[in-house]
């Protein structure tokens, strides 16, 4: 009797086991899905960042008269970046979305900023300022900053690459509040404030 019961138990147990092989998951497919998710996140981040950066730039110029004299600087009003600028965790995806390479590119600019009023557009690449070439790669932004006089109003000659066309612009710097803006995208409740050092959109 024990033999029959034991045999029956083994038979039932064996019948309960999977009778086919488990599916083999493709690592190529999962890597592709991960890349798609990362790209979607980066695009979502940009869709939030760019409008707020445009708004922030306009506010800094429009509110210049409200800032103390010591809290004003001269600027052209362009938010610039290249392939080394984005957060490392989404850098590859940001570079893909914006077409960023070693050259310094206009990511956004305000409508009332000097560059915006002069006709410069997001996507333009900065090649030269006053006949001096802008460095490429990791030193691109510092190369640009060194050529901008923060203390005095000045007319600049800019050489821009737009698509495959090189265009010359003249842009006169204007005063803006010296502090910059920070965009915190981890907060689900919108808020905006300035503390004298930075302006925060969250």
Language-model regions: role of each:
Residues 3-12:
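Sec-dependent N-terminal signal peptides
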Residues 15-35:
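Bacterial Sec signal peptide processing site at the extreme N-terminus
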Residues 28-43, 196-199:
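Acidic/histidine-rich, surface-exposed loop or edge segments in extracytoplasmic proteins
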Residues 46-104, 170-187:
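PDZ/PDZ-like peptide-tail recognition elements
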Residues 56-67, 119, 130, 148-149, ...:
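Sec/Tat-exported extracytoplasmic proteins
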Residues 115-140:
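Conserved PDZ fold ligand-binding element
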Residues 142-182:
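PDZ-domain C-terminal substructure recognizer with occasional recognition of PDZ-binding tails
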Residues 180-202:
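Polar-ligand-bearing catalytic/cofactor-coordination segments
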